[in-house]
Design a protein with these regions (language model features):
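Helix-loop junctions and terminal segments of transmembrane helices
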Residues: 1-27, 81-86
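Transmembrane helical elements of multi-pass membrane transporters/channels
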Residues: 1-8, 29-32, 66, 70, ...
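Hydrophobic alpha-helical transmembrane segments of multipass membrane transporters and ion channels
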Residues: 28-36, 69, 73, 160-168
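Interfacial segments at transmembrane-helix termini and the short loops linking adjacent helices
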Residues: 41-72, 144, 177
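Short runs within selected transmembrane alpha-helices of multi-pass transporters and secretion channels
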Residues: 39, 62-112, 117-142
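Transmembrane alpha-helical segments of multi-pass transport proteins
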Residues: 100, 153-178
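Juxtamembrane/transmembrane-helix interface segments of polytopic membrane transporters
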Residues: 45-49, 108, 112, 120, ...
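Membrane-water interface at loop-to-transmembrane-helix junctions
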Residues: 19-34, 58-66, 84-96, 100, ...
Length: 178
């Protein structure tokens, strides 16, 4: 949906500040939607998995959280991918994703024996954080010119909404004795 607009901006050599404004505007909306889903899962996911899968699947909740939470960052920064494609600078991202896969596979192989499925999920979590959050955000900031500190300042101002939703869900569960 954003690709035509972003491509037009890239062709016109739009200044990075305008890309930043779009990145923040769309990212805030995506954060609201995704934080609602993640908050609902944090509040109700354990009970949902217990009802759906039954006994013996308690670790599935923690596995889901370890994978779901770091994936929220590239989801709320999806506009950046459109910007990379429009500027024809997506090769670096592809290389980072290859490194994420190698790191994930290596850590999973190393940790799954000792820590089981939680170790595998932790390996995925660490690989995502290093690649998708640290390295890709650095690339957006240093090489593309998107003001990532300003983006995170805007997102962090919205975090109380997510915390309130999670707290309300927790109180509902507590009141219902679930």
């Amino acid at each position: 949906v954003l690709m035509p607009k972003v491509t037009k901006m890239a062709v016109k050599n739009t200044p990075p500040s305008e890309f930043t404004a779009l990145f923040i505007k769309v990212g805030r909306l995506q954060f609201l939607l995704i934080s609602f889903i993640v908050s609902a899962f944090v509040a109700f996911g354990r009970q949902f998995i217990a009802l759906w899968a039954g006994a013996g699947y308690e670790d599935a909740y923690y596995v889901a959280l370890l994978v779901m939470i770091p994936v929220t960052v590239p989801l709320i920064q999806n506009t950046g991918l459109n910007i990379l494609y429009a500027m024809n600078k997506h090769q670096f991202r592809s290389a980072v994703y290859l490194c994420i896969a190698v790191l994930n596979a290596g850590l999973t192989f190393w940790w799954v024996e000792e820590y089981g499925i939680i170790g595998a999920a932790m390996a995925t979590c660490i690989a995502y954080v290093v690649g998708n959050i640290l390295i890709i955000n650095w690339y957006y900031y240093k090489k593309i010119g998107i003001d990532i500190p300003l983006f995170w300042k805007n997102i962090l101002h919205m975090c109380p909404v997510m915390l309130v939703m999670g707290t309300v869900g927790w109180f509902i569960l507590d009141a219902l004795h679930i």
